[in-house]
């Protein structure tokens, strides 16, 4: 018989970890100019305080948007911010990660599932996007046919980098 005692089932994260995950998730939305709803903030607080489980928080956010009779343009932005924040909170408190192209596309799918039809897919067309952080200018994006190879190259460079040799006094 195989002994599975060494495999411990992951439980709910602690208060500090949940707080950090929510703050990070909401902060990532702010980078894109998105602001979460007051309802998400209150629901996140309840999750952090242990008044509700994460699954209950996730369901409350989902139900909040399903119950809206009419939608405004602002609702679309808060829906994206709230849903992505909820997904990011979940990802950040899991103790799993695959440093691969498949892992990266899986993260994209899990963050944007229910928000964008293309969640988890590598784009097959070229894009430009006006970035508010660049005062409306755009960055140069990798050409669609080269994305897969560019990601694989970047991941390999990261795998080979030895962070133990970085002077901690020089790091941010």
Where are these regions (language model features)?
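FIC/Doc superfamily catalytic core
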Residues: 1-172
């Amino acid at each position: 018989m195989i002994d599975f005692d060494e495999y411990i089932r992951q439980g709910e994260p602690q208060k500090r970890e949940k707080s950090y995950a929510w703050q990070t998730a909401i902060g990532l939305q702010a980078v894109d100019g998105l602001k979460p709803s007051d309802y998400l903030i209150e629901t996140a607080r309840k999750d952090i305080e242990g008044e509700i489980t994460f699954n209950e928080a996730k369901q409350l956010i989902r139900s909040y948007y399903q119950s809206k009779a009419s939608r405004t343009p602002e609702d679309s932005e808060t829906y994206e911010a709230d849903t992505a924040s909820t997904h990011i909170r979940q990802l950040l408190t899991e103790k799993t990660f695959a440093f691969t192209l498949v892992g990266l596309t899986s993260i994209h799918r899990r963050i944007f599932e229910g928000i964008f039809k293309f969640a988890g897919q590598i784009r097959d067309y070229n894009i430009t996007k006006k970035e508010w952080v660049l005062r409306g200018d755009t960055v140069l994006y990798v050409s669609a046919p080269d994305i897969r190879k560019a990601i694989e190259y970047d991941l390999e460079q990261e795998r080979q980098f030895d962070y133990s040799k970085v002077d901690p006094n020089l790091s941010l």
